[in-house]
Amino acid sequence: MKKKLYEGSSKTLYSSEEEFLLVMAFSDKATLENGEIIDVSGKGVLNNNISSFVMNKLEMIGIENHFIEKLNMREQLIQYVEMFPLQVVVSSVACGRFVKEFGMDEGFVFDKPIIDFKVKSREFKYPIVNEHQILNFGWLTKDEINTVKKQALRIYDFLSGLFIGIGIRLVECNLEFGRVFTGEESLVMLTDEISPDTCKLWHINSNERLGFELLEKDPAKAYESYKLIADRLKEK
């Protein structure tokens, strides 16, 4: 019988019958910016489908990630990874904090994608942390930081092309990484999920917000937005 190991805002981790493998289950829950938790019926199924599809595609281009296989509608088998305590946010368009903190016009396109490191802490509102702090806190080595940045940009470039191909613009994505030990060596690996919960996605023609951004503004329309993305990816 699988044992619950961790329950987050939208996913739960369970043990599996195999050592170093876990079961990740997607729920319909969503935590809004104001802390309110709501249910969007069917969201977990769609996110499982989308993330499984994307992780498979990334594996095909040489991006190591924790995804092994989709088990059922809501669950997937993943490799155990020692998680870095960071979110790696890649942005190519001014939105969110760039508008609030720098007064930029929303929608302004950067010459190159910008990488932000954020501490994974809802309690402290995910503060920005720089590379010197990450090194001094002992969270990552210099080589690991460089690998994470290189992989994050490569992932973002691939995802941008993937979404453009289905009429959707990737504005920002939130990635997570960790390390896997192979003997005395360690490998940096992509973890968590890639879905409308972790990406800011706009309709390429109208700039209509999709996925989680739409969920924040109009929860009643959220499911159809997630389904639109899943259906278009299915056709790829």
From Swiss-Prot:
Reaction catalysed by this enzyme: 5-amino-1-(5-phospho-D-ribosyl)imidazole-4-carboxylate + L-aspartate + ATP = (2S)-2-[5-amino-1-(5-phospho-beta-D-ribosyl)imidazole-4-carboxamido]succinate + ADP + phosphate + 2 H(+)
Superkingdom of the organism of origin: Bacteria
InterPro entries in alphabetical order: SAICAR_synt/ADE2_N (IPR028923), SAICAR_synt_PurC (IPR033934), SAICAR_synthetase (IPR050089)
Assigned EC number: 6.3.2.6
Species of origin: Rickettsia bellii (strain OSU 85-389)
Single GO cellular component term: cytosol
Gene Ontology molecular function: ATP binding; phosphoribosylaminoimidazolesuccinocarboxamide synthase activity
Taxonomic lineage: Bacteria, Pseudomonadati, Pseudomonadota, Alphaproteobacteria, Rickettsiales
PANTHER family per the UniProt record, alphabetical: MULTIFUNCTIONAL PROTEIN ADE2, SI:DKEY-6E2.2
Pathway: Purine metabolism; IMP biosynthesis via de novo pathway; 5-amino-1-(5-phospho-D-ribosyl)imidazole-4-carboxamide from 5-amino-1-(5-phospho-D-ribosyl)imidazole-4-carboxylate: step 1/2
Protein's UniProt name: Phosphoribosylaminoimidazole-succinocarboxamide synthase
Pfam family, one: SAICAR_synt
